[in-house]
Structure formats: structure tokens, C-alpha cells
């Protein structure tokens, strides 16, 4: 995967042309020496309102669309 492209799960699709996508990654905890699952939620632009809750989507960085949206949906 190239830089600026992430894969995540749609957690909220109630707004018009906007979905929330949760992106999970595994990191090594420095103190506890264990693998920990981290999550980050992105507001993503969905022009055609095609995404539904639970869909696995690929998102890409984009120029700012609004105050919180800097990502767009590439693939469903």
C-alpha cells in the first residue's frame, strides 16, 4: 500500500456524504512489552453515499474538504 492510503471499517454512515472510518493498527507497548491494538477514527468524504456501516473501505489522503475531512473513499 502506498503512503496516504489506509484500510478501515465504516462505523458511522448517517451523515450526508460523510462516513466515519475506524483504522486499527498493532503497536508494540514499550513498558508492558506486549502487542496492543490501537484505533483511530477518520471523517471521510463519500460523494455518492455508497458506504454502509460495517463495510471495509480503502481511504486516501486528499486536500481539506471541510474542517475535519481530509480523506476520501477510494474503494469499497
Swiss-Prot record:
GO annotation, cellular component aspect: cytosolic small ribosomal subunit
One of the GO BP terms on file: translation
SUPFAM superfamilies (UniProt xref): Nucleic acid-binding proteins (SSF50249)
Keywords: Ribonucleoprotein, Ribosomal protein, RNA-binding, rRNA-binding
GO MF, one example: structural constituent of ribosome
Record's keyword annotation contains rRNA-binding: yes
InterPro entries: NA-bd_OB-fold, Ribosomal_uS17, Ribosomal_uS17_bact/chlr
Classification via PANTHER family: 40S RIBOSOMAL PROTEIN S11 FAMILY MEMBER, SMALL RIBOSOMAL SUBUNIT PROTEIN US17M
Subunit structure: Part of the 30S ribosomal subunit.
Protein task: One of the primary rRNA binding proteins, it binds specifically to the 5'-end of 16S ribosomal RNA.
NCBIfam families tied to this protein: PRK05610.1, uS17_bact
Family: Belongs to the universal ribosomal protein uS17 family.
Name of this protein: Small ribosomal subunit protein uS17
Organism, as annotated: Anaplasma phagocytophilum (strain HZ)
Gene: rpsQ
Amino acid at each position: 500500500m502506498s503512503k496516504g492510503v489506509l484500510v478501515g471499517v465504516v462505523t458511522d454512515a448517517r451523515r450526508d456524504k460523510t462516513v466515519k472510518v475506524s483504522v486499527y493498527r498493532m503497536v508494540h507497548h514499550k513498558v508492558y512489552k506486549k502487542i496492543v491494538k490501537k484505533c483511530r477514527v477518520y471523517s471521510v468524504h463519500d460523494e455518492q453515499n455508497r458506504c454502509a456501516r460495517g463495510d471495509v473501505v480503502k481511504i486516501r489522503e486528499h486536500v481539506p474538504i471541510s474542517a475535519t475531512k481530509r480523506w476520501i473513499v477510494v474503494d469499497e
